[in-house]
């Protein structure tokens, strides 16, 4: 049902991105709303609205693959910083993985994050004069690189991974088929290639959660001069 809702609204979401004068945080929210309005009553609302007191994470506590996402009050900061990087065409090409990592770390929504930020990222790449061959990526390799990017944002891990898939600019008429051919987005898998596994929520203001946020904040993602 969710895949059907997503695929039926995909063309409309792509068209809205195409005609947007600029890509902003509001654009990200609108893209999510367009894609999932038939499935989630909260489509287009970020976690600051839907779950302002919850911490969202992925993976087992203590695992090397444990990923802590941005706290609700900082979601817009993370997305805006990624958009600021992307506004410079040269930086967008060099730091395509950094931008995607910031969007993924922000994790604006309770569900549908990966598919939403994929579309936004594709549009940003197009405006910067290149494309990424997402259908050539492999789900597990990509998600591992993405998790490592979030946990170690200064190492350029996802930049290095995505450089292998940078292509000349792709015609917009090809985007729909390209997206639906990405491993996991063709409707044959119960888990989306861009929305991996189950996320666990906790109360954001507990000492444990605050310690985790402090550890993430120490990684200095948001530099004054990116």
Regions found by a protein language model. Give the residues of each.
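FIC/Doc superfamily catalytic core
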Residues: 1-111, 115-226
